[in-house]
UniProtKB/Swiss-Prot annotation:
Signal peptide: none annotated. It comes from Mycobacterium tuberculosis (strain ATCC 25618 / H37Rv). This is Small ribosomal subunit protein bS20. Binds directly to 16S ribosomal RNA. InterPro entries: Ribosomal_bS20, Ribosomal_bS20_sf.
Length: 86
């Protein structure tokens, strides 16, 4: 446990951020998994719809600093390629 008051506050802030980041990353994984399942099933219409929502989530996570912007771009590119293969 920290003795310095500012570090105690940082610890509380970091814990809140960690929990928020964990929730965002979990929803990202769920969205990507749903898209991949639709793409694997060959449902192009549903996959296209899920791709749009997944891209929004990736962009939002990147803008909030949860993931790096290049990681978001790489995931979006890979998912778009998977959709185009259908």
């Amino acid at each position: 446990m920290a003795n310095i008051k500012s570090q105690q506050k940082r610890n509380r802030t970091n814990e809140r951020a960690r929990l928020r980041n964990k929730a965002v990353k979990s929803s990202l994984r769920t969205a990507v998994r749903a898209f991949r399942e639709a793409a694997h099933a060959g449902d192009k219409a549903k996959a296209a719809e899920l791709l749009a929502s997944t891209n929004r989530k990736l962009d939002k996570a990147a803008s909030k600093g949860v993931i790096h912007k290049n990681q978001a771009a790489n995931k979006k590119s890979a998912l778009a390629q998977a959709l185009n293969k259908l």
